[in-house]
Amino acid sequence: MTIMRKKHPLIKIINHSFIDLPAPSNISSWWNFGSLLGLCLIIQILTGLFLAMHYTPDTTTAFSSVTHICRDVNNGWLIRYMHANGASMFFICLFLHVGRGMYYGSYNMIETWNMGIILLFAVMATAFMGYVLPWGQMSFWGATVITNLLSAIPYIGTTLVEWIWGGFSVDKATLTRFFAFHFILPFIITALVLVHLLFLHETGSNNPIGLNSNADKIPFHPYYTIKDLLGAFILLMAFMILTLFFPDILGDPDNYTPANPLNTPPHIKPEWYFLFAYAILRSIPNKLGGVLALILSILILAIMPLLHTSKQQTLTFRPITQTMYWILVADLFVLTWIGGQPVEYPFTIIGQTASIAYFAIIVILMPIAGMIENNILDLN
């Protein structure tokens, strides 16, 4: 078996990725989220496949087909709620995974990091289009509002929006193409994940102290296979509690009303995992400015390697930058809360302050903190 594992053209790739892979001996549970994201992706593809068997991407029947899945299909309610809440679990793992990368300076592995940013954009696009498919009120108006933002692009904006809509409003053509894209994107994401792993295995994993761990490596199996399995069980436990006991807690009640172009919901807001970006978008009174801020809120991750001023890679031994980091985390919670509130005083001013703080901490305060720490430790 050993010979087969190491010699077979296909199996040896798996062997070098998950079995005989040399891994640092001290990586903590923060390194579990990569495998958990893989698990989330598999759950989403499988549940999505079964939903697609019963779903009809047509404005007249989409809402009814989702109702039909929940009422008439064997365990359809479970598949539907697993898919909806699976997206939430996916984003929780994503945010923790990115947060881990920021804390431990993993952005210095530039190819892996940039691939991760592309993956983040792809997952966000997939989730947005998936939210449109049930064709409830929030689906329809969310699609209308977000696609409409592209009209802020000078000169080609309006043409671009109508091209994406396939008409003069969000309608049958829009729903059909969103379903097509929503179906294909997870497979593209799977391919990108393999590239992400390919880049990661060029350098090997980072570790909590940020030092080179080549002198002290252990095989991935059994040490990290069993550790990942424990993480998977904890995730599945939380996931099933959410799905079976509180399936609608993260959803919007408005989406149980069929889409009606003649009736606008009082508060149009996206799913919770987009609220921080939505708050940043709304905090700028100019349409184009808001769109740019929205894109930059994620794209800013790409310049993190350039903003790294410290002589140490991780934040493990850097209390000043640590403080900045946790203020940033708190700021993201504030933005998430504001994104779900109506546009009125005092929420607007809180949102603007939190948006400024978000960019200021990443671009100004954390790099300065790194330089101060270098001076304190006399590392210059």
UniProtKB/Swiss-Prot annotation:
Keywords: Electron transport, Heme, Iron, Membrane, Metal-binding, Mitochondrion, Mitochondrion inner membrane, Respiratory chain, Transmembrane, Transmembrane helix, Transport, Ubiquinone. Its cofactor is heme b. The cytochrome bc1 complex contains 11 subunits: 3 respiratory subunits (MT-CYB, CYC1 and UQCRFS1), 2 core proteins (UQCRC1 and UQCRC2) and 6 low-molecular weight proteins (UQCRH/QCR6, UQCRB/QCR7, UQCRQ/QCR8, UQCR10/QCR9, UQCR11/QCR10 and a cleavage product of UQCRFS1). This cytochrome bc1 complex then forms a dimer. The chain crosses the membrane at residues 33-53, 77-98, 113-133, 178-198, 226-246, 288-308, 320-340, 347-367. A ubiquinone binds at residue 201. Heme b b566 binds at residues 97, 196. Binds 2 heme b groups non-covalently. The gene is MT-CYB. Belongs to the cytochrome b family. It is found in: Mitochondrion inner membrane. Pfam families: Cytochrom_B_C, Cytochrome_B. The keyword Transmembrane helix applies. One of its GO terms (molecular function) is ubiquinol-cytochrome-c reductase activity. One of its GO terms (biological process) is mitochondrial electron transport, ubiquinol to cytochrome c. SUPFAM superfamilies: a domain/subunit of cytochrome bc1 complex (Ubiquinol-cytochrome c reductase), Transmembrane di-heme cytochromes. Heme b b562 binds at residues 83, 182. One of its GO terms (cellular component) is respiratory chain complex III. This is Cytochrome b. Heme 1 (or BL or b562) is low-potential and absorbs at about 562 nm, and heme 2 (or BH or b566) is high-potential and absorbs at about 566 nm. The keyword Iron applies. Component of the ubiquinol-cytochrome c reductase complex (complex III or cytochrome b-c1 complex) that is part of the mitochondrial respiratory chain. The b-c1 complex mediates electron transfer from ubiquinol to cytochrome c. Contributes to the generation of a proton gradient across the mitochondrial membrane that is then used for ATP synthesis. It is a multi-pass membrane protein.
